[in-house]
Amino acid sequence: MSIRHFALAAIASAVFAGSAVAKDYELLNVSYDPTRELYQDYNAEFVNYWKKSHPDDKVDIKQSHGGSGKQARGVIDGLRADVVTLALAGDIDEIARLGKSLPENWQTRLPDASTPYTSTIVFLVRKGNPKGIKDWGDLTKEGVSVITPNPKTSGGARWNFLAAWAYGLKAGGGDEAKAKEYVQTLFKHVPILDTGARGSTITFVNNGQGDVLLAWENEAFLALKEDGGKDKFDIVVPSLSILAEPPVAVVDKNAEKKGNTEIATEYLKHLYSKEGQEIAAKNFYRPRDAEVAAKYEKQFPKLDLVTIDKDFGGWKTAQPKFFNDGGVFDQIYQAQ
């Protein structure tokens, strides 16, 4: 073998050996408030899945949780998320627009507009439903105290608000003035605005404040599942709610800098696998996979749902109209 051929063979051998070298990954998932349990379970499953094809790799997945809007602002301001799993597309749009850390067409990169599971908004009430709460109209009755987070910082709160608006609009015959009047009256019954959904759950469940919690469906089920929950609380399903679609995305700029693009991408893709969908369903999120959804069909109540795209023009319309400075929420809340 010539010196040249020997050198080329040595380089090829080194490249091949380098590709097989074990890697040490630390992945940061910046998520919204009530997904702690979901991703604790999913992270363990994903590490096992990854190690089947990368047995010598070390994978450490960190979680960060808080109100979705607050979390998005953190990523824009420099929190080095490899992936974001937030409450609504509008928050990831802001990361793309202001942070320039992923493309603005990020929702096209994964199935179902990058939303591997869905949820909705239900009511959690005290056991026996002492205030007789059956639907949105009951929330504005005298003496009823409602717990919901702040739409300025919480994605769940924005879903809550839009579900309430949809009810007010329907009850008012399509008149936006009547919908606005309804949500303004509703927020007069809200004594405290926590920054995130889990904070509101703690206020209601642990601190005993309020008669009804406007909750992510998964959060309401979790409250029943915890010790003694079924003896303390009931779930009330309203006549109308909203299809809550919490999306996921790789934060390209951060993942590339940390050498995590491949594993971060696979981390999100695996959410769509049978294993990922099972974990979502077991944590009370509605799975996208038809077979898994059929298996858990009895777990999830059927109800009429409005959608962000069809009924509100998408987040690019809904966010400025309702939640930006001077929007509908500011108008009705500051007027109190």
Feature roles, as predicted:
Residues 23-154, 333-334:
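N-terminal segment of the mature folded domain
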Residues 120-129, 245-262, 279-283:
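A bilobed periplasmic-binding-protein/Venus flytrap-type ligand-binding module shared by bacterial periplasmic
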Residues 128-134, 153, 166-174, 254-262:
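Short helix-loop capping/hinge motifs at secondary-structure junctions, enriched
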Residues 255-336:
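Extracellular/periplasmic juxtamembrane helices and adjacent flexible linkers that interface
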